[in-house]
Amino acid sequence: MLIFYFRKVLDCRAAEPNAAHLVLSRMEADGKLAGIVTQNIDGLHQKAGSRKVHEIHGSALRSYCVHCRTQYGPDYIFENQDPVPMCPKCGKMIRPDVTLYGEFLPHLAYDNAVGLMNTSDMLIIGGTSLAVGSAAQMAHLFHGRYLVIINKGPTKMEGKADLVFHESIGSVLSELYGDD
């Protein structure tokens, strides 16, 4: 069931970055962005050109063998016609490299995200209501000077924010940082 769901719903190979992804990539290239912490699993930040991306829920564009830990790219699992893709090296199941409910967050991504929360002057929270526990917990770890929230709807942290925009993150970042 998981593999069927993964193949039919999570195939994000054809997705393209939006204005927010592109502006964040430019900000990173200009030295204005220390990193991106994302709970999205679509790889669009990297597709836009960002390199300092910490995927706290993993990536749908990676998969691995649950036994020998061999890594596989997105085409292997999405194009494989077997009911459950099996590792050609050891014969065990291959699973998507995404964090499912009840699983622990990837340690390296989590540790890097915590490091950013501890060392950054400004945190921009964008495109999330902070309803998912891991994102909300990350936001509470930030103790820098400025908290900016950009989300179409309300969030739980607006009372602590220095600036709040109830608009799309792409339009706000494009307006503030400029379009190319």
Question: Whereabouts are the PLM-identified features?
Answer:
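Conserved catalytic alpha/beta core of Sir2/sirtuin-type deacylases, generalized to analogous enzyme cores
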Residues: 1-180
